[in-house]
Amino acid sequence: MAEHETPEPESVKLFEGMSGSDSGNIPTYDVTIRVRRYNPEVSDKAYWDDFNLTMYRTDRVLDALHKIKWELDGSVSFRRSCAHGICGSDAMRINGRNRLACKTLLKDLDITKPIIVEPIKGLPCEKDLIVDMEPFFQAYREIMPYFINDSNE
């Protein structure tokens, strides 16, 4: 299991001119994200990779994954789109529960232990956190969960 660390960011100043020593600062904390990695071009076996990050209190799991991809390991693969909990493209298992990475705040998880991030179950894994959604969409098309208008109006 590989470990990666990011440099510690300075706290962010929200409002200039506020009184108090920490007024307007967003506190930071250290967190370990444990990502289930899988690359069929390299091996048919999955493995775990730990990433040690310093994150802000307002960050979500998606922010941590972005930080990992952009600053530590560009090969980490995951889906994301709207980042507002609408599209569902960043669905994954976070600490054993199916969740949206864009809606899950890190501060709501137990950060004293590694946060486990893995692909959702029940669909074939293509790479890292990306699953093949075609079986889901095929079942969706078969049940036709929408209205069909037979009239010309």
Set out the residue ranges of the language-model regions.
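Signature of N-terminal electron-transfer/Fe-S-associated modules in redox systems
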Residues: 2-153
